[in-house]
Amino acid sequence: MSFGNSKEIRRSNTMMLIEVLIICYVGYLSSHLVEYVFNSHVVAISDFATQVGIFSVLVVISGLSVGLYEIKLRETFRGIIRRIFVSVAISYFIIEVITNTFLNNVEISQYYLPTYAGMTILVLIVFRYFLNRLGILGLGQSKIVIIGAGERASIIEKRMRREVDRFGFELLGFIPIQGDNREEGIKNEKLIHVNIDENFRNFISDNDIDEIVIACDQRRGTLPVEVLFDCRLRGVEVSDLLDFMERESGQIVVNLMYPSWVIYSNGFNSQNYLRDALDYSMNCIMATIVLMLSWPFMLLTAVIIFFEDVNVKNASVFYKQQRVGHNGQLFNIIKFRSMRPDAEKDGAKWATTNDSRVTKVGQFIRKYRIDELPQLLNVFRGEMSFIGPRPERPEFVEQLIREIPYYNQRHNVKPGLAGWAQLNYPYGASVEDSMEKLKFDLYYVKHQSIMLDILILIRTVEVVLFGKGR
């Protein structure tokens, strides 16, 4: 988490103070709402004030831990909603424990805390929306200028055309410099013609620039290092194109990667035995909970699959398929069968959207990810995690390693039931699709954390509940 210069720290502190006051006021409104709607008295004034105060501080602290007050936070609005939801959910759980442990002798309306938490989520979402739209406090909104207007700089223009892709920043334009490939570069109307010399700092201060992104095609002899260093000393962030794209798009652009960046950049710290043991324990607990909740659906699915192809020879309910797992080790994945028994009579094939080999039952269970549930056994075995890159077949992996740089690095973490790539890229069925998905897989490998796993789980639940699967 980065907090920036003193000006930015004051902005962040101001935001936290404002939201503490807002949450306290929401607590007051919630008490009246509960009394009016449910005709239920909340609690005595002293205990009420204590509860509201603790909850308000907890929400802000949780928000701080998930990056809601980070100066350089760039998120889509849906991403901000998820962070607000997580911070309030954590706070709600803690305040429930505190209330039941230390305030168990106080009569508190059973409707109050759920109402308070729900209204807090709603009010914070509305507040953040208008805050970002109006650019108040400058939090989450930064002015950016790109040095370079050639082929590399055009990647930003191509991948960030939509307004939602630029939700957290304002792009002033591109500064062309010597050595840029202008044939593949930026069009004239988006260019800024300014010399990067000792007067460049005046341009930066006059336009209140927060960040400079280096995206020139040729660096040697074209970048004024002293001028850029002076900008950094003045509190302006200077970023590489690869780091900028990683931060803003949630992916690592593979064709921009170079060996020194992989070696020296933060992240990619996958080998940690203590964390691995903790992850396995948490995965087993989660798998047990999911199994207890889903076993009736699994039993019903197995019966329906059995009767759908009851007269077809060798039509099993489950199927096993070899996949490449952690550190390249092979294992057998277990799934409900969603394709015809003879789906691969001619050899391994990429699965495609609207694949004709998928059965009628298979279409439904794939849409709601029910076919993945037997992989809970793979989780118990330690072959898979809940969150991680989806495992591929060895026949495809051999080809992909030959054709895609750094593809093998996705095997540095355990494969998962759900992954960052599956949420951000449509169903892949080719080498080109695998290249795009790898950008998100590498982002996950580099930034693997509990917070990222929680966000992926929340979005995966949305996919399952609303049938946004394959």
Specify the residue positions occupied by each region the protein language model found.
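C-terminal terminal-structure detector
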Residues: 38, 381, 404-470
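N-terminal hydrophobic signal-anchor/signal peptide
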Residues: 1-21, 126-295
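Membrane-spanning helices that line or support transport/gating and their immediate boundary helices
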Residues: 33, 129, 133, 137, ...
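Short, glycine-rich, amphipathic interfacial segments at transmembrane boundaries or analogous
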Residues: 180-184, 245-258, 315-357, 418-437
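A hydrophobic, helix-centered structural microdomain
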Residues: 275-342, 450, 456-470
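Signature of alpha-helical transmembrane segments in polytopic membrane proteins
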Residues: 1-139, 470
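Membrane-cytosol interface motif
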Residues: 84, 88, 140-158, 313-339
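A short, structured surface patch at a secondary-structure boundary
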Residues: 351-414, 456-460, 464
